[in-house]
Amino acid sequence: MESQKQIKVNTADLEPSMYVARLDRPWTETPFLFQGFFIRNQDDIEALQHHCQYVYVDFEQSPKEITHTKTDVSRENRTITQITSLHYAKPHTTASNRNRTVYVNSQPVEKELSVARTVYAEANQAVADLITKLEVDGRLDVQIAKETVEPMVESVLRNPDAMIWLARMKKYDSYMYHHSVSSSIWGITFGRHLGLDKSALHEIGLGCMLFDVGKTKLPHALLTKADQLTKTEWHVMRNHVDYSVNLLEGAGGITERIISMVRSHHERHDGSGYPDKLKENQIPTFAKIAGMADCYDAITSTRPYSKLRSPYEAVREIYSWRGTLFQAEVVEQFMQVVGVFPTGSLVELNSGAVAVVIAQNEARRLKPRVMLILDENKKRLPQFNTVDLLFDTHLKGAENLWIEKCLESGAYGIDPQELYI
């Protein structure tokens, strides 16, 4: 039954700027990645026409001048100032893609986890030791970091989902330690997705691990302040980039590519970043990768002045910065890494069961592997079984199993950080 705000519209009558709230079929049977989106252009209309006969348009969210009785062709070129979701993924092919290294998972996530747990724990301890030593004698031991990154790269190459799972399950006794390791994991994983060679992955992992070492030169009270920073405090905080670069240059054994990566990882596509206000192609590629890894991990972490947001919320927020804070193509590729329902997300299936996403299916991002936590009656299961939504299509009467919606962190009292497989 149609509501007053959601009107059934034939796809032949769609216009740019309309907000598509529902389809005439399950979202998972289409390539539209998010459930609900604004129509941006004719390409979006043609994609909808290809997959659907009709859709439901929410006219409260659509611009007021749009009606469902008349199509105004002149509005086809209207600029959409707010796109709230990534919705349609097209193949991304460039000349450089032909030279990229193609990596294939060589271990299932469950098997890789047994190794990754040790690697992750040792990495966190190594970073803690490195920071402690730096604070005591002012010397940055780069060799510790290099030896730490090596097994992290190897684990990500075998199966990135294991390290991603552990990064998502991180504890918060020290944000700085865990953020360094987790950002390194995301940077390596992103580089793997882009097809960079192993040497480049080592550089990215090392740069992401060390890009915040300059914060050891900042007042502890500033780093742990629970309120938003003042303008003066923010200016002081920004100095950590220069401190990090100076420490790396003084330590030796660091490539120029890593130095430029660390210096520019807070630069933004529109020129609003720091310290040099670089924009667009002025920003080094490795810095773009590091900036994305840093941003995503920060959003999904508990910080002194900000509570964590779910991976799904982080994806939506980062996508809203597409073309402004971050280069559009970089965002789109990173979305392919984290998935529509990122690892660690709490989700509700169409059966009513509640699960946590534990791994991605690269071929079908809408069909990840999940671990069942609650049954269809929201009762905690005695055993947490894993289900591959791409292949395990029959469960408790759900003839075709899919993710119905993403849940907020902490829904039904579930803390994903306490779950292990």
Language model: regions and residue ranges:
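Membrane-cytosol interface segments
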Residues: M1-L140, K396-I421
